[in-house]
């Protein structure tokens, strides 16, 4: 009788450097599985237009459902989504748009005001861990659980949240 050791091993957030779209996608999915499993209370997703993120991926949305659903049992959860171009998100990721509607009470979507989209950081942040795409075009970057690194990035993201963005990407669009 064989046993699957991986089934008993909880996922761990990836650390170090990543290189390429495939690895970036894998690390985003894995980090969100860890967020769901460990009950991370706050997430910040920041990107100019989320092109190159696996936001339309069924597996990722199921993981986001698990993370969001944990708010019932494990305390309040919050996800801040910072984006310069939500119209691109709306067109490219209809499944994510539907997910956003279901969990609107946990999401704070903010429209970034910026002249150059390249100035917007590409970051997935939590209090315990974060990942930054330093080279968006080639999907290269770093993931770290260093406390100081996470604190510094929370301060940078706080600046974007409070001074350089406004509420955006409503869950429903009301019309006449």
Predicted segments, located by residue:
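PLD/PLD-like phosphodiesterase catalytic module centered on the HKD motif
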Residues: 1-44, 48-176
């Amino acid at each position: 009788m064989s046993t699957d050791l991986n089934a008993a091993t909880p996922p761990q957030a990836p650390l170090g450097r990543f290189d390429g779209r495939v690895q970036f996608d894998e690390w985003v999915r894995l980090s969100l599985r860890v967020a769901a499993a460990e009950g991370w209370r706050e997430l910040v997703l920041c990107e100019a237009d989320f092109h190159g993120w696996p936001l339309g991926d069924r597996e990722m949305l199921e993981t986001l459902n698990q993370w969001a659903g944990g708010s019932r049992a494990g305390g309040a959860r919050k996800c801040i989504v910072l984006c310069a171009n939500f119209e691109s998100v709306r067109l490219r990721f209809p499944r994510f748009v539907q997910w956003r509607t279901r969990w609107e009470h946990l999401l704070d979507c903010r429209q970034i005001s910026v002249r150059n989209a390249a100035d917007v950081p590409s970051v997935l942040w939590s209090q315990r861990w974060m990942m930054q795409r330093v080279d968006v075009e080639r999907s290269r970057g770093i993931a770290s659980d260093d406390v100081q690194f996470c604190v510094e990035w929370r301060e940078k993201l706080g600046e974007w949240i409070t001074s350089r963005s406004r509420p955006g990407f409503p869950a429903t669009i009301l019309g006449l």
